[in-house]
């Protein structure tokens, strides 16, 4: 009797389908790391099953609280990483556009950095150089996308295939890029086969930030934080983050691994205001998460030492 293969989805962990046909949002796992700058090692107590959805404000009862809050406001810092390449550039290089929809292609180009647009112009007839510059030695894992994207790239540069070539689009139609700086976010990524969510979050955090698991304390009492969004490609995404605190005196590691060199632009801690500035305006839910975490820790620090 022929046995039917039992599928276990690596995206949602449910049975009956694989990740390519999963109806759930494309899910990534990561860690939001909080640092208390110049406050020493704090022993902050957390209530079990804490949900950030219940946090909406910081209560300031008197002038002493206001003064304390003004001191603490820049002491709570969040670890952000910037990607080496913009999402617009990656989507373009992966061939996630249609020659029948120039408006969407123009939108992707506007999301790119000026340096990326210049790179395309300089290599308008050399897709392979653009591809290897994007993925380095990891290009083999994207072989399927490579062949499809290269065909699209060659077509959009061929006047016999399209009315508007990529070169003409770059030089005459697409307005200036919207952003001059890369996109910032938290360390995260998708699970490897057979990997659990928390394992994935820790691995991605270590690979992207350079910190080790011994440098941080994952706050188990706070429930994982969920960010839902829809990409410019119409695909639904879900980012699930564990909250963690920095417990070592380790400086921010230098970007030196092969993974970091090709994927990460920078790693740094930022104050609440700077974090809000670096996160792009359309990431409203991410900004709200940072705000709730800031309120949460302000309340915790304000109450330290109070009876």
What are these model-derived regions, one by one?
Residues 1-27:
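A short, cysteine/histidine-rich metal-binding "knuckle" motif
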Residues 23-27, 72, 234-236:
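A short catalytic or substrate-binding loop motif that flags glycine-/basic-rich loops and adjacent residues
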Residues 29-35:
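Short beta-strand scaffold segments in enzyme catalytic cores
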Residues 39-71, 108-109, 150-172:
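Intrinsically disordered, low-complexity domain-flanking/linker segments in eukaryotic proteins
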Residues 83-85:
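Short beta->alpha transition motifs characteristic of CBS
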Residues 87-99, 103-111, 116, 120-123, ...:
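Unchanged
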């Amino acid at each position: 009797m022929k046995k039917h293969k039992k599928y276990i989805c690596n995206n949602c962990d449910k049975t009956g389908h694989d990740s390519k046909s999963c109806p759930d949002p494309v899910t990534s796992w990561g860690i939001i790391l909080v640092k208390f700058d110049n406050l020493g090692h704090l022993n902050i107590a957390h209530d079990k099953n804490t949900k950030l959805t219940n946090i909406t404000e910081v209560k300031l009862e008197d002038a002493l609280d206001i003064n304390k809050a003004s001191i603490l406001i820049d002491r709570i810092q969040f670890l952000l990483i910037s990607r080496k390449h913009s999402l617009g550039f990656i989507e373009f290089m992966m061939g996630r556009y249609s020659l029948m929809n120039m408006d969407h292609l123009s939108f992707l180009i506007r999301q790119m950095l000026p340096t990326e647009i210049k790179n395309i112009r300089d290599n308008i007839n050399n897709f392979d150089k653009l591809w290897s510059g994007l993925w380095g030695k990891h290009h083999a894992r994207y072989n399927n996308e490579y062949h499809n994207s290269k065909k699209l790239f060659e077509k959009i540069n061929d006047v016999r295939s399209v009315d508007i070539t990529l070169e003409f689009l770059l030089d005459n139609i697409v307005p200036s890029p919207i952003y001059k700086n890369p996109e910032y976010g938290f360390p995260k990524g998708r699970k490897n086969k057979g990997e659990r969510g928390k394992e994935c979050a820790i691995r991605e955090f270590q690979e992207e930030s350079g910190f080790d698991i011994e440098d941080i304390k994952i706050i188990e009492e706070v429930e994982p934080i969920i960010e839902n969004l829809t990409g410019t490609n119409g695909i639904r995404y879900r980012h699930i983050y564990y909250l963690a605190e920095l417990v070592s005196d380790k400086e921010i590691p230098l970007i030196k691994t092969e993974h970091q060199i090709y994927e990460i632009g920078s790693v740094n801690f930022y104050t609440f205001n700077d974090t809000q500035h670096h996160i792009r305006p359309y990431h409203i839910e991410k900004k709200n998460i940072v705000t709730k975490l800031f309120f949460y820790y302000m309340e915790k620090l304000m109450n330290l030492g109070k009876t």
